Amino acid sequence: MIERLNSPFLRAAALFTIVAFSSLISTAALAENNPSDTAKKFKVVTTFTIIQDIAQNIAGDVAVVESITKPGAEIHDYQPTPRDIVKAQSADLILWNGMNLERWFEKFFESIKDVPSAVVTAGITPLPIREGPYSGIANPHAWMSPSNALIYIENIRKALVEHDPAHAETYNRNAQAYAEKIKALDAPLRERLSRIPAEQRWLVTSEGAFSYLAKDYGFKEVYLWPINAEQQGIPQQVRHVIDIIRENKIPVVFSESTISDKPAKQVSKETGAQYGGVLYVDSLSGEKGPVPTYISLINMTVDTIAKGFGQ
């Protein structure tokens, strides 16, 4: 047994298990000794910050909502920590996107015992990824359509009511109020983007994360890679996008906040298309950052796109 643990992999695995188990014990002990524990708020844990914000708007002050991934994090290939296991295990409900977004989550969830979960994209009609190794698989960035966000709201409301029925009235009321705010987003966004001439409406980005936004507002989508993964901005991908930009005289290209802007800037340099700046999609910023909420993320992204096209 000692010889086997000389393997670096096994030593790391053993250390991970010990740390996670110790943390769980410590957390449980603190809960036992805390007399106010029985009065604690219903706790929701989400896989990333956008779901956290939507859920907190519905939960209001009767539940606490935390995200496993931090603001600004790359969420596709996130590496969970023992602390994340403790956080999830202490939850009353876990909310996740599904559609192959959190490729780490299903394995992670195997470590969590007796905590219910809900997929917040249930009922959304997926748009398939068009090309590359993920061709035909559902594009997971469904929240980039405000109309889809209404489905997120309803799924989260149902999950909260099911698992915390004592506060059903609050959840129902807050969900309705927040849905009205989301509905109010569409008209001004549509009017702003409609100023861009139809022949110019090509949305060129690094990751193919804007399919739902592009469909809603009449853009053709071009991207350097379909989903943030190991191969980003390889020569064949870059050349393909450069050819499309030149052929269609596309005036502007963008990158995303959680990845390097170098590939997009390379394309801009080689084609003469303007580099339009950073779009936000996978993660919110901190409270003092530019996109601390889902609504601000949508507004900021559309504003950046419109300005990139001179609108």
Swiss-Prot record:
GO terms for cellular component: periplasmic space. Fe(2+) binds at residues 76, 141, 207, 282. Keywords: Ion transport, Iron, Iron transport, Metal-binding, Periplasm, Signal, Transport. The keyword Nucleotidyltransferase does not apply. Residues 1-31 form the signal peptide. GO terms for biological process: cell adhesion; cellular response to iron ion; iron ion transport. It is found in: Periplasm. It comes from the Bacteria. There is a second metal binding site (site 2) involving Glu-162 and His-163 which can bind Mn(2+) or Zn(2+). It is unclear what its physiological function is but may participate in protein-protein interactions with other metal- binding proteins. Monomer. This is Iron-binding protein YfeA. It comes from Yersinia pestis. The gene is yfeA.
